[in-house]
């Protein structure tokens, strides 16, 4: 009876672009929802304090903001794994290839993006602080040392660690969006916004990072709302999640 009723439901998009599915993932508890929203929100607030600059004069940008520079990047060491947990939780109960790809992609994101943050953020901050304590050092020498370190092939803007870590997050975001749309009845806005947010978050200084995290929060709310609506309108005979 369940199979027959499920097959009778056409796999067409509804008015909001979401697709009916045979079963819905378990609803998030209030605590889980607070975690899904709170982590990106606090991360966005932290990134608002990220020192500015174009990246071509890193010593000059950071020399008077060393404490803030270090606090932001040490904080990011906490939020990187927490964001991975957020995406993993968002995919709870969702099956399919896209969901598996999204979960696997979180591993290189956490490993390599964290390594990049340690060196590019904390390492640069410590180096700038030490150079500030050497008044005999020529200003040009300080600038060159910091710039050369920050542009090293492993940790530069398009270096090995940052590139692999960023690609991990982007792939995880895109795959998660596809999985939620195809297998969890999410509206089409969810994969679109997740892809955009992943791209913006990897360019983490403001306004990009905070904007991407804000879009991520909007995506979570859209998905949760669609899940509530899908459960409320599920036809008789279609299995509901407990």
Language-model-detected regions and their locations in the chain:
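Cleavable N-terminal export/targeting peptides
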Residues: 1-2, 11
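Hydrophobic, aromatic-enriched alpha-helical segments typical of multi-pass transmembrane helices
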Residues: 3-5, 17-241
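N-terminal intrinsically disordered, low-complexity tails
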Residues: 9-15
């Amino acid at each position: 009876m369940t199979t027959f009723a499920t097959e009778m439901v056409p796999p067409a998009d509804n008015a909001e672009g979401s697709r009916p599915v045979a079963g819905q993932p378990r609803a998030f508890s209030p605590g889980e929802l607070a975690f899904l929203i709170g982590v990106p929100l606090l991360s966005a607030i932290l990134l608002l304090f990220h020192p500015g600059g174009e990246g071509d004069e890193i010593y000059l940008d950071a020399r008077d903001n060393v404490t803030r520079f270090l606090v932001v990047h040490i904080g990011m060491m906490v939020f990187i794994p927490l964001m991975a947990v957020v995406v993993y939780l968002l995919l709870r109960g969702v099956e399919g290839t896209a969901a598996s790809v999204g979960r696997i992609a979180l591993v290189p994101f956490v490993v390599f993006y964290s390594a990049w943050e340690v060196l590019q953020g904390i390492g640069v901050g410590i180096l700038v602080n030490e150079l500030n304590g050497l008044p005999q050092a020529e200003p040009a020498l300080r600038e060159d040392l910091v710039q050369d370190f920050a542009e090293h092939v492993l940790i530069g803007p398009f270096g090995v660690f940052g590139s692999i870590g960023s690609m991990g997050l982007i792939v995880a975001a895109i795959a998660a969006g596809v999985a939620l749309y195809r297998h969890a009845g999410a509206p089409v806005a969810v994969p679109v916004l997740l892809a955009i947010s992943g791209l913006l978050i990897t360019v983490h200084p403001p306004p990009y990072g905070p904007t991407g995290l804000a879009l991520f929060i909007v995506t979570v709310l859209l998905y949760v709302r669609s899940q509530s609506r899908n459960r409320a309108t599920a036809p008789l005979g279609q299995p509901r999640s407990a």
